[in-house]
Regions:
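Short solvent-exposed strand/turn elements
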Residues: 339-354
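Structural signal for hydrophobic/aromatic residues that build the beta-strand cores
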Residues: 18, 69-72, 250, 285, ...
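Eukaryote-biased intrinsically disordered, low-complexity acidic regions enriched in Ser/Thr/Pro
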Residues: 2-160
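Conserved mixed alpha/beta core segments that line enzyme active sites in large multi-domain catalysts
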Residues: 314-316
Length: 354
C-alpha cells in the first residue's frame, strides 16, 4: 500500500491522535484517567490500519485491538490497556518539550569547536559514500534513487538496533516512495520524517553532537553508515538555498552552572566563535520556547542556512526552524532574570567559510 506525506488522510496526524491509558491500574474507576501519547510514527501506523479497517495495528511492543479498543502486549495477552482515538484541531496538539530544550550538543561539551560551515559528520558521510563536494544529489539527480535506498536501509538497521523495527519500516517505506522523485520532494519527505517524534531525529542528533569529543569519536563514526545517507539527504536542502538574515530564534535548555559559566566566558572573548554540529530545532515563538528549562537562548541570525519546517511539520504551532549543522555562533550577552528565575543567553548566528 502506498504511503504518502501528510497531504493524504492516512498520514495526516494534525487532527487525529491515538492515546493509551497510563494509570498504574488502567482499570481503576476511582482514579482520574491519565492518558499518554503514542509516538508520531506509532500514530501513523495505528491510524493507517484503522482507516484500512484492519482488525489490529501491530507496533514494536504492542498491538492495538480496534474491536475492543485495547493495547495488548505482544508477548502477554493479559497485559492490556484501554486506548482511544482523539480528533482535535491542530492547535490543540501537545508541545514537545524535549525537542526544543535538549542541548544542541553534548552536555559535557556544551558547544562544538569551530569546524567551518560543513559538519565533519557530513564530510565523513560523503567520504564513506565516495561523493565529491560537487556531486551532491541536488546537483546530480541520478544519485537520488541509490541514496534514498541506502537511507531507507540505514533507518531500518538503526530501528532494529533500538527495538523499533516497525517504526523504522514505516519511515523507510515513506522515503522509498520518493526515490524516483526530484530532490525537492525527497528533501520534503526527509524534513517531514525528521520533524516527527521518533528515534530517527534523536539518534541522528545524538551521534552528531559527539563530533569534536575525542573520547566519543568511534561512537559517532559508527553511525555514518546507517544514519549518514539520511543525514546527507536532509543536509542537501535544495529549497532553502539562500542564507536567512535579520530574524530571531529561541530555544530553551536546562543548563548546569558550569555550562552557563562557559557561555559567560565567551562573552569576554568576542572574537571566539563555536559551531553547532547537529541539526538544531528552534522556534520563532519566544513564548513557547520560554516554557521549558532554566535557560533561554535568544539567537539573532546574521546570515545562516536555516530551514522553515513549520509547513511540513505535524506541529505547525511550534514554528520550528531547523539550524543546519556547522552554523557558527558568538555569545553576545548572558543575563539572569530574577523574576523568571531564568538565564537569557544571547547568541549571534552566522555562516563561516573557514
Amino acid at each position: 500500500m502506498a504511503t504518502a506525506l501528510p497531504t493524504e488522510s492516512k498520514n495526516n496526524l494534525k487532527h487525529v491522535e491515538w492515546m493509551w491509558k497510563s494509570n498504574p491500574n488502567p482499570w481503576s474507576k476511582s482514579e482520574p484517567a491519565q492518558w499518554s501519547h503514542y509516538s508520531d510514527v506509532e500514530n501513523l501506523i495505528i491510524e493507517e490500519a484503522f482507516l484500512d479497517k484492519k482488525p489490529k495495528a501491530i507496533l514494536d511492543d504492542y498491538y492495538i485491538d480496534f474491536q475492543d479498543n485495547l493495547q495488548v502486549l505482544n508477548t502477554d495477552y493479559n497485559r492490556q490497556r484501554p486506548v482511544k482515538r482523539v480528533v482535535r484541531n491542530r492547535e490543540d496538539k501537545h508541545l514537545r518539550e524535549t525537542r526544543f530544550m535538549d542541548l544542541p550538543t553534548t552536555s559535557a561539551r556544551s558547544f562544538g569547536g569551530q569546524y567551518g560551515w560543513v559538519s565533519p559528520f557530513v564530510v565523513e558521510v560523503r567520504r564513506d559514500l565516495r561523493i565529491k563536494p560537487n556531486e551532491l544529489p541536488s546537483k546530480k539527480p541520478d544519485m537520488i534513487p541509490t541514496l534514498v535506498e541506502k537511507a531507507a536501509n540505514g533507518i531500518i538497521e538503526e530501528g532494529k538496533y533500538l527495538g523499533k523495527e516497525r517504526e523504522a519500516e514505516k519511515m523507510a517505506n515513506m522515503l522509498r516512495e520518493k526515490k524516483n522523485k526530484d530532490m525537492k520532494e525527497v528533501w520534503k519527505c526527509c524534513a517531514y520524517l525528521y520533524s516527527l517524534e521518533s528515534f530517527l531525529y534523536q539518534s541522528l542528533n545524538a551521534a552528531m553532537r559527539l563530533v569534536g569529543d575525542k573520547d566519543k569519536e568511534d561512537e559517532w563514526r559508527s553511525k555514518i553508515r546507517t544514519l549518514g545517507p539520511f543525514c546527507l539527504l536532509l543536509w542537501d536542502d535544495p529549497i532553502h538555498i539562500k542564507m536567512k538574515t535579520d530574524m530571531v530564534l529561541y530555544r530553551g535548555a536546562k543548563l548546569k552552572p558550569e555550562q552557563i559559566a562557559a557561555y559567560e566566558t565567551m562573552v569576554n572573548n568576542p572574537d571566539e566563535h563555536r559551531s553547532f554540529q547537529a541539526f538544531s530545532s528552534c522556534s520563532r515563538n519566544r513564548q513557547k520556547a520560554e516554557e521549558f528549562g532554566n535557560t533561554l537562548f535568544i539567537m539573532e541570525v546574521k546570515g545562516a542556512f536555516i530551514a522553515d519546517l513549520s509547513k511540513l511539520s505535524e506541529y505547525p504551532n511550534e514554528e520550528e526552524e531547523l539550524i543546519t549543522p556547522g552554523v557558527c555562533f558568538r555569545v553576545k550577552k548572558v543575563e539572569f532574570d530574577r523574576k523568571k528565575n531564568k538565564h537569557f543567553i544571547y547568541l549571534e548566528l552566522f555562516q563561516s567559510s573557514s
